[in-house]
Amino acid sequence: EHTVEITARGLYSNSGQGLHRFHDPVDGATYLYTHFEPSDARRAWPVMEQPDIKTRFSLEVRHPRGWTVMSNTRPQAGGSSPQAATGTECGCETTSFAASRPLPSYLTALAAGPWHRVTGQWTSPSRPGLTIPLSWSCRASLAEHLDAAELLDLTRAGLDLYDRAYAYGFPWDSYDSVIVPEYNLGAMENPGCVTFNEELYLFRGPVTRAQRAGRANTILHEMCHMWFGDLVTPTWWEDTWLKESFADHQGTWAEAEAAGYTEAWVSFASTRKAWAYLEDSRPATTHPIVARVDDVEAARQAFDGITYAKGAAVLKQLVAHVGQEAFFKASGLLFERRAYGNASLDDFLHVLSQVSGRDMHDWARAWLHTAGPSVITDELVVHEGRIASLTLQQEGSDPVSGWSVLRPHTLVVGLYSFDGDGALVRTHRLPVVLEAASLDVVEAVGLPAPDLVIVNDEDLTYAVVRPDETSLSCLTGSLGSLHDPMARSLAWSMLHNLVRDAVIDAALFVQAVLVHADDDTEPSTLTVLLNQALRVTCRYADPHTRSVFLERLVADDSTGPSTEGEPATVSGGWGRLRAAAPGSDAQIVRARAWLEAAGQARLLGEAGSAQVAARAREILDGALPGLELDADMRWRALTALARLDAVSANELEAQRKADPTASGITHHLQASSSMPHQDLKAEVFERLLSDTTLSNDHIDALVAGFAVDAHRELTASFTPRYLREIQGLWAGRGQEIATRLVVGLFPACGDEVDAQAVEDWLATHPDAPTALRRLVLKSLDDLRRALTARRTGSVVL
């Protein structure tokens, strides 16, 4: 046995990687926290960075007296001891932590500072004597915004649920949750010391139900990791799905079961799966769920929409295939056999096959080892008002291998018709199993002809669905009559996928959003739709249609001729906002979306821009009853005005002084860098390339200020410089910061000239790092997709 002692001095980080240091501008306090996944523990202490190298860690921290220090385990009894200061007037003390259970290095954690901390405890309902201390912490200057009672109650409810479902006791001796500033991710599952993104989950003003549900989802996602990922850790990063896909799936399930957000799977369908379909549609980013990962640089890019969202959607299909009871029983068996160790795909398949009585390896080969989505279409034949035949067809091509792929789909086909009140209601639910290239749904023959067929109703499987012509016509003309939240979410997903793939025109989608996305739409779905409508308008529409629909996104309601020649209301984004119920979630969602669209109004010319700026001023002046003007909403309005060159530097500075928080400083940086001036664009671009002192949040703010779609005429000239610099940026910055710069400064709303310049760079830089090339290819694919959509042929409706 050998002992190696290392004494070292390290650098604090401002990138969110390693040991990050933050100075609070409000009270001058300093806070530290770690983030190591996948391989940044080496930035703080010398370790072996492999997930299958697990050991017990013990930590001793010397820190200013009065600080609270948290780690993976409880502090040892009497573990805080005062020490004499060395060369200072203030004293220090040392906090010692008990040795942890076996952990890989990336899960070790430390959070230190004068935190505001609220404590509680949880007692297992099924294991007498198992009581775990709980806490929630945030910066002291934000103490008034910590919803401690709500968060502790949610934590207990989640632990109750997982305790019952997994039949394996909570495997750690404490559960601290720390909300931290300048965080790169949503959260991180360090056992016993979970960290959360302050900007996302510490609410400083009014928020929607969807935001609270999203916070609950993240909390329960990380809690699931205490078992999937922490207790049983993937052997290597190609099995990242064994923790992230599971946590994404289980977090959504628990959001509904423990937190009471019964719309959780609707939100999953409209948000998480949209991310999955986008990542899976790009040749540059699609990969099998179980992907080859050669090194830790590649591992960092494995945390994507395939590993998280597609993997979770496929797990939902797995549960539909084998049943929830078998899934949970297999999970508990895996925990028993691999506790505090590692596991691979084969380990999970073995226990699942054992419990379900089915050999799951063929299922896994079809779903986990192939890339790209299945595409399912339906062919409906009607005779004399009744269904003569209904045929489902699936096709799939793995972009990685080039092979044709057929997957087994356990799904539901929903038949919808208009009722007497004009609502689209489901008249028949047809469960089917599609395993071959086609399937005749014999149960449908003879049923009344539907107005709409929704393949994959209830969202049980993962597939891109192409509706038949009758259904597409129904969706574009009457989607607002579809009142079931899940069916409505799936219908919107179908339409957006059709636009993204240039099957239908951008105008059809934006028109549908303006007409049919009413205030009864589930808030998370409404948020997604309004964001998609703006993106489709700015990126996918040809220049003429872009101006027409951008004007509608920011305009008041107006009247125009209907098909019968009678006046009809033409919906506008401003009109929809003014009509939203005061204080409602819909009002908050529409105000945020309208201000984002308003920031692009330079595309409407001087007169149009001035009118939009005047309306943004109305919001700032409180002209919308019920809309609370918290700091966030004020900054949104001021940033929109800055993008329109309709606000002064003095006004922005006055708001910064009124909101002197870290968030306020970051918002001020974004707003002040958003003005449409050529010299300012050059200054911001140069600062992003050369200023290595910028924190991760401040880089994001400057990138957002620089890369405004409506300012493309001011930023187009920077593309050649961008392409000259990115390889040096990749080599000279940490991967987290470099990724933000490479993606954020890419000419995302460019033209054919930009696309060709990027292709030339790829051709002349074949030896550029694989991870860098992947990011460039990903952004190029999005640009090429947008250019194709612009050529589809817009028809202004």
Regions flagged by a language model, labelled:
Residues 1, 97, 135-395, 399-402, ...:
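Hydrophobic alpha-helical and helix-loop surface patches within well-folded domains
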Residues 1-25, 46, 87-89, 437-449:
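A surface-exposed beta-strand-loop module
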Residues 4, 57-59, 95, 134, ...:
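Hydrophobic residues positioned within well-ordered beta-strands of beta-sheet architectures
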Residues 7-11, 62-64, 100, 197, ...:
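Solvent-exposed residues in well-ordered beta-strands and their adjoining turns
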Residues 21-31, 182-185:
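Short edge-strand/loop segments of extracellular domains
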Residues 34-39, 46-220, 248-252, 261, ...:
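Hydrophobic helix-coil surface modules that form long, contiguous segments used
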Residues 305, 387, 403, 442-797:
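Long, ordered, helix-rich scaffold segments
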Residues 360-361, 371-456:
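Beta-strand-rich binding/interaction modules
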